[in-house]
């Protein structure tokens, strides 16, 4: 196994991990920003107020993007297992 192939596998793994983490993280970021703007506009300084909308937003994002995320992960694992003989030998 050459250093280039190790770097390619690592690069692909990082790319897949970023693609899997991005939808829920972006949903939490946007909902937190929106709730913070509403709290600033209404001068409500309750720290726990933003948790429930964030949790619900992440949950619904995972429900909507879940099949795509699962297909992405399965495609990567199929590719990785298909390359396993080349990696070992």
Curated annotation (Swiss-Prot):
Subcellular location as annotated: Cell membrane; Bacterial flagellum basal body
Gene Ontology biological process: bacterial-type flagellum assembly; protein secretion
Membrane-spanning intervals of the chain: 16-38, 55-74
Protein's membrane topology: Multi-pass membrane protein
InterPro entries: Bac_export_3 (IPR002191), FliQ (IPR006305)
Any one Gene Ontology cellular component term annotated for this protein: plasma membrane
Stretches of the chain forming a coiled coil according to its record: none
Keyword match Transmembrane helix: yes
Keywords: Bacterial flagellum, Cell membrane, Membrane, Transmembrane, Transmembrane helix
Keyword Transmembrane included in the entry's annotation: yes
Cited function: Role in flagellar biosynthesis.
Family the entry assigns: Belongs to the FliQ/MopD/SpaQ family.
The protein's name: Flagellar biosynthetic protein FliQ
